[in-house]
Amino acid sequence: MTGPAQTGSTSAKVTVGTQMSPVQAQEELLNLFEQEFMGVAQAMPADKYGFAPTAATFTTAQSAKYDGVRTFAQEISHVTTANYYFASKILGEKMPVDPKSIQSLTTKEELLKAAADSFAYAHKALATITAENAYTTIDGVDGLHTRSVVASFISAHGYDHYGQMVEYLRMNGVVPPGSK
């Protein structure tokens, strides 16, 4: 069975050949990522937020090292911080929250609220992207120098961590929402 993410049913119907504004295009991507990310964050039971894979999780024939692997909660904290960071670059302003305050959150409730707030801030940033400024260079990050590219990277970066979180769910016997 396929979920909304696999079928594309989360996006509104558009007429092929219709011109979209940069913000509409970016919002489409961010909305899908937000829905999927928040879905996996909500799906993990609160008592499993401290879960991280270890060598003991796998067969003895595997020799991978797991030092420094983030817990499920730390994955949420990382993406939340990144959302604020990348969105602040689009807006050309200082991050409105201290990253250390996000990293200190430990409960599911706190982390879900922080993540939701970071997505709201990202939507605020995307709302400032216009046809005129989408590809004007900004003080970007890691070689990303336009609002449009940084906006796309919010989702691209987040999906990397979303994929890890999906595996954490499965390791704990939880079917990810996108697979239902």
Question: Where does each model-flagged region fall?
Answer:
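Surface-exposed helix-capping loop/turn segments at secondary-structure junctions
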Residues: 42-51, 126-135, 170-177
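Acidic/histidine-rich, surface-exposed loop or edge segments in extracytoplasmic proteins
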Residues: 10-22, 92-104
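Short, contiguous alpha-helical
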Residues: 27, 35-38, 52-100, 139-180
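N-terminal targeting signals for Sec/Tat export/insertion, comprising classic cleavable signal peptides
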Residues: 16-51
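Acidic/histidine-rich alpha-helical segments that form the ligand environment
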Residues: 104-137, 149-161
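Bacterial Sec-dependent N-terminal signal peptides
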Residues: 1-11
